[in-house]
Amino acid sequence: MKEIPVGLSNEMTIATTPEMGISHLGPGASFYSTPAMVGHIEATALQSLLPFLDPGEQSVGVRINVAHTAPTPIGMKVTVRTTVQEVDGRRCVFAVEVHNEGGLKIGEGSHERRIIDVSRFMGVTKGK
């Protein structure tokens, strides 16, 4: 693993689709869901770490603390921004913000990832 700089940022803009929407409120409730937002936060953080990983390494999410603060209709774009706040060995903590295309902040919080050795990880999880 190469040294990961504190302050490293990454952004990803996503056009929301019906598959990313909530469904439990019934027809007509076409809004971007919290699970979709969390998945996009993880993907954005992961993408920022890829250039710092050695062959055989990967990062996995281990903690997320996010508030989904405003609804966004399906069809709008959202932009996820992750910024490295802290690096401690193989542990990396990100500050996260999510805005919709209207500029409204719809989510914020933190996300933690760990750098793992894939073969070792697979061995540990094999019998479970």
Task: Name these PLM-found stretches.
Residues 73-74, 84-128:
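HotDog/MaoC-like acyl-thioester-processing domains
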Residues 46-79:
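Hydrophobic beta-strand-centered segment that forms part of the acyl-chain substrate-binding groove
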Residues 39-43, 47:
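Short, residue-level hotspots on alpha-helical faces of the histone-fold
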Residues 1-33:
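Catalytic strand-loop segment that frames the active site of acyl-thioester-processing enzymes
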Residues 34-38:
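Short, charged, low-complexity patches
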Residues 8-10, 60-64, 76-80, 90-92, ...:
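A generic structural signal for short beta-strands and their flanking turns/coil linkers
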